[in-house]
Amino acid sequence: VERRWTAVEGSSMYLRVGESYTLRELLEGLLLASGNDAALAIAGSLGGSEFIERMNRKAEELGLTASHFENPHGLDAEGHRASAHDLALIMAAALQNSVLAEILSMRSSCIHGVTYVNHNKLLWNCPGVNGGKTGYTKAAGRCLVTSCERGGVQLICVTLSDPNDWKDHAALYDWAFETYAEFSLPE
């Protein structure tokens, strides 16, 4: 871990300069603890200055049309933006990756003797929630992307700048699963 990766504002997994972490450990610190330092360490290790270009290329491949990335952690920056629709597409893609799906569903993880608890409290409070990512910046406010599966149906919910995100996600899932009806179209 390089010192420059640890000098970032906001949430952190408190990486130790000079210590080694696996990519899996950094992903857990990023996704459970919202570790901005982990995001910088991943970007620095996997591509340096080219990492953001790779992120934006991947965004195009995923069909994201209203998002552009300027940094790996999502903190406010000129030109950095993401729409609710695009965040849902990112979550859907992440859930297709077994490692990311597993990490997103973890309630906690112990890395180098430090326990990280997932910021997504819906994992404890909302039946069927099996993943998600919290976010907050002064410009964006509270943002939340979650996934929930009940009865073999998987849904993704995204709220942006929502001070009641936990209640809103739980209520939206309850409403959607209560009103969802499966039917066959006539041929």
Feature annotation, model-predicted:
Residues V1-H85, A94-L95:
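Active-site-adjacent loops and short helices of periplasmic peptidoglycan-processing enzymes
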Residues L64-T65, D76-E187:
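Domain-terminus/edge residues, biased toward the C-terminal soluble/receptor-binding domains
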